[in-house]
UniProtKB/Swiss-Prot annotation:
Keywords tagged on the record: Acyltransferase, Cytoplasm, Transferase
A Gene Ontology biological process term: protein modification process
Source species of the chain: Syntrophotalea carbinolica (strain DSM 2380 / NBRC 103641 / GraBd1) (Pelobacter carbinolicus)
Gene: lipB
Occurrences of domain BPL/LPL catalytic (ranges): 28-203
Protein name: Octanoyltransferase
A GO molecular-function descriptor: lipoyl(octanoyl) transferase activity
Function: Catalyzes the transfer of endogenously produced octanoic acid from octanoyl-acyl-carrier-protein onto the lipoyl domains of lipoate-dependent enzymes. Lipoyl-ACP can also act as a substrate although octanoyl-ACP is likely to be the physiological substrate.
Keyword Mitochondrion: no
UniProt-annotated binding residues for substrate: 66-73, 133-135, 146-148
HAMAP family for the chain: LipB
InterPro entries named among the record's database cross-references: aa-tRNA-synth_II/BPL/LPL, BPL_LPL_catalytic, Octanoyltransferase, Octanoyltransferase_CS
GO cellular component, one term: cytoplasm
Length: 211
């Protein structure tokens, strides 16, 4: 597993990198990879998205092939693109989504924030609102897209949409909940730690067969 921190990168550039790595991983010429990035302000619209959930078109909108509806990205939000070969991990996309939720719930707990799942919804929620959005896709059973964890971003961009297509959805962040500055670098480190730790419990099929 390779971890790549891309810093702040335009969405289109990060998407092109995902596509190239997905092809390489599917061909067996690159290792599974976790990309970490922050994006300049942009809205992304998933496969089940509806433009009526966009209330203001003053910011760039990109239509993409992940699941889910519309969401917002901006600096101060940690975006993760895990590129995993589910062909070696049971081809279970639902399990993969629950895995991502567990990673983010654990990372939030390290900052003193209690996150949880909501039945019938994908993502991480808190009593104060939705903390993280998750939307995934796969090509040749290699995952792309991933999660967006609100760390310390300006949340006003969410007021111009119905986040994830949910009317009245309140978005929050680790910084808003804790009421104090939250270090992006520290959150990043905790996400990586929990991602790698939990991934070790999700053995590829080839390894399971040898147990």
């Amino acid at each position: 597993m390779e971890i790549k921190d891309l810093g702040v990168m335009p969405y289109a550039e990060a998407y092109a990198l995902q596509e190239q790595l997905v092809r390489d991983i599917a061909a067996g010429s690159a290792p599974e990879t976790l990309l970490l990035v922050e994006h300049p302000p942009v809205y992304t619209l998933g496969r089940s998205g509806h433009m009526e959930n966009l209330l203001d078109d003053s910011i760039e909108v990109v239509s993409i092939n992940r699941g889910g509806d519309i969401t917002y990205h901006a600096p101060g939000q940690l975006v993760g693109y895990p590129l995993l070969n589910l062909g070696l991990r049971g081809r279970d996309l639902r399990h993969y989504l629950r895995f991502l939720e567990e990673v983010l719930i654990a990372a939030a707990a390290d900052t003193g924030v209690e996150g949880f799942r909501r039945e019938g919804k994908t993502g991480v929620w808190t009593e104060q609102g939705k903390l993280a959005s998750i939307g995934a896709g796969a090509r040749r059973w290699v995952t792309m897209h991933g999660f967006a964890l609100n760390v310390c971003l300006d949340l006003s961009g969410f007021s111009r949409i119905h986040p994830c297509g949910i009317v009245g959805c309140t978005m929050t962040s680790l910084q808003q909940i804790t009421g104090q500055p939250v270090s992006m670098a520290q959150v990043k480190a905790r996400v990586v730690y929990h991602f790698q730790s939990l991934l070790k419990t999700w053995l590829p099929l080839a390894q399971v067969a040898t147990l």
